[in-house]
Regions:
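Fungal secretory targeting signals
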Residues: 1-26
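Low-complexity, Ser/Thr/Pro/Gly-enriched N-terminal "stalk/linker" regions
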Residues: 20-129, 159-192
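Well-ordered alpha-helical scaffold segments within catalytic/enzyme domains
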Residues: 24-29, 72-86, 90-105, 141-159, ...
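Alpha-helical junction/boundary sensor with strong preference for TPR arrays
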Residues: 50-54, 85, 122, 153, ...
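Carbohydrate-binding/catalytic loop surfaces
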Residues: 55-65, 127-133, 137-149, 185-206, ...
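Short sequence/structural elements of tandem HEAT/ARM alpha-solenoid repeats
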Residues: 109-113, 228, 292
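Non-catalytic carbohydrate-binding regions of carbohydrate-active enzymes
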Residues: 130, 281-295
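Aromatic- and glycine-enriched pocket-lining scaffold segments that form the walls
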Residues: 165-236
Length: 295
C-alpha cells in the first residue's frame, strides 16, 4: 500500500536535506508539490555524483573517495546517516523511496542497473571485485536496499535474476553462518575476510544492520525464524553494552578484550538501523497479537 501522508516523505526529505544540495531550497511541509519539488532538486544534486551509468564505469560504484557500501546506502533510505560524513554516506540514500513517495521514475533504470550489477555470483551481494572492502555492514547495506525494493514493490529484476526478497534473504542466510559464538559470546565481526583490517572488531553497524534485515524479513514474511534472529542479535548487542540502558549506541569492541572495552563514538546511523528494525519488530509482534485475537 502506498503511504498517502506527505509527512512520511517529509522525513525522507529531511534526511536528504543533509546532503548539502547547492543553494537554498524552498520547502512547505504542508504542500505535497513543494515537498516533491524540493526532493527532486536534491535527488538531482545527489545523482550528479554518480558515474556508474557512464560508459567505462562500473554500475553500483561511486567514484573515489567513496566506498562500495556507500553506493548501497544510496539505494535504500536509512533514517539517519553518519554525521561526520553526511555528504558521503547516503547520496543515493532514498532513490527507491524517492520513487515510491513521489512517483518520479527518472532514476529507476539507473537504480535497477546498479542493484543487479552488484548481486555477485552467489546472488547475495558479495561481488568478487569488492573483497578488499567487503565487510558484513557493507553487504548488509545492499541487502537492506534489496529489502526496501521488495517492501515498496519496486520493479522486478530482469528474467533469470532472483527477486528482491530472495536477494535480501541471501544476505541474511550468508550472515547467519558468520555468527561467531567463539568470541565475545556471539555477534558478527566487522569484516568477513581475516586479511581485512577490522576482522577482530565486532561493530554495532554490522550487527545492527543484521538486526534490521532480520526484523524486516520477519514482518514481510511472517516467519518467526527471522524474528528469533532479530531478538538474538539485539540481545547480544545489549548484553555487550554496545547499547546502554538509556539507549546510547557505541561503535563496537575488539575480540581481544572480549568486546568489553568499546569505542564509545556515537554515530547516528548505528542508532538509525536499530530504530528501523525495532519499528519492524513492534509491527510484527502487534500483527501476531492481532491475528491471535482474530482466532
Amino acid at each position: 500500500m502506498r503511504l498517502s501522508s506527505h509527512y512520511a516523505f517529509a522525513v525522507t526529505l529531511c534526511t536528504l536535506a543533509g546532503q548539502g544540495a547547492n543553494g537554498a531550497i524552498t520547502l512547505d511541509l504542508n504542500d505535497d508539490n513543494s515537498i516533491k519539488s524540493a526532493a527532486s532538486t536534491i535527488a538531482f544534486d545527489m545523482m550528479s555524483e554518480y558515474t556508474g551509468n557512464r560508459t567505462g564505469d562500473t554500475p553500483g560504484n561511486l567514484p573515489d573517495p567513496y566506498y562500495w557500501w556507500e553506493c548501497g546506502a544510496m539505494l535504500v533510505y536509512l533514517s539517519t546517516c553518519r554525521s561526520q560524513t553526511v555528504a558521503d554516506n547516503d547520496r543515493f540514500g532514498t532513490m527507491i523511496n524517492y520513487w515510491y513517495y513521489t512517483g518520479d521514475t527518472s532514476y529507476n533504470d539507473v537504480t535497477m542497473q546498479a542493484m543487479v550489477h552488484q548481486i555477485g555470483a552467489d546472488q547475495d551481494y558479495m561481488p568478487e571485485n569488492q573483497t578488499k572492502t567487503l565487510g558484513n555492514d557493507d553487504q548488509a547495506f545492499w541487502g537492506m536496499a534489496a529489502l526496501t525494493a521488495a517492501e515498496t514493490n519496486f520493479a522486478a529484476p530482469p528474467v533469470g535474476i532472483p527477486g528482491w526478497l530472495s536477494l535480501a534473504q541471501g544476505v541474511f542466510n550468508e550472515q547467519t553462518r558468520r555468527w561467531d559464538n567463539l568470541t565475545c559470546g556471539g555477534g558478527l565481526r566487522w569484516q568477513k575476510f581475516f586479511s581485512n583490517v577490522g576482522y577482530n572488531y565486532k561493530n554495532t553497524i554490522s550487527n545492527g544492520a543484521f538486526f534490521n534485515i532480520a526484523a524486516r524479513l520477519a514482518l514481510y514474511t511472517g516467519n518467526q525464524t527471522y524474528a528469533d534472529w532479530a531478538i538474538k542479535s539485539y540481545d547480544w548487542v545489549e548484553a555487550t553494552g554496545m547499547i546502554s540502558g538509556d539507549y546510547r549506541v557505541s561503535d563496537g569492541g575488539h575480540i581481544e578484550d572480549n568486546c568489553t572495552k568499546q569505542d564509545t563514538t556515537r554515530w547516528t546511523y548505528n542508532a538509525g538501523v536499530f530504530m528501523m528494525g525495532a519499528a519492524a519488530m513492534y509491527n510484527f509482534v502487534s500483527l501476531l497479537i492481532f491475528n491471535c485475537g482474530q482466532r
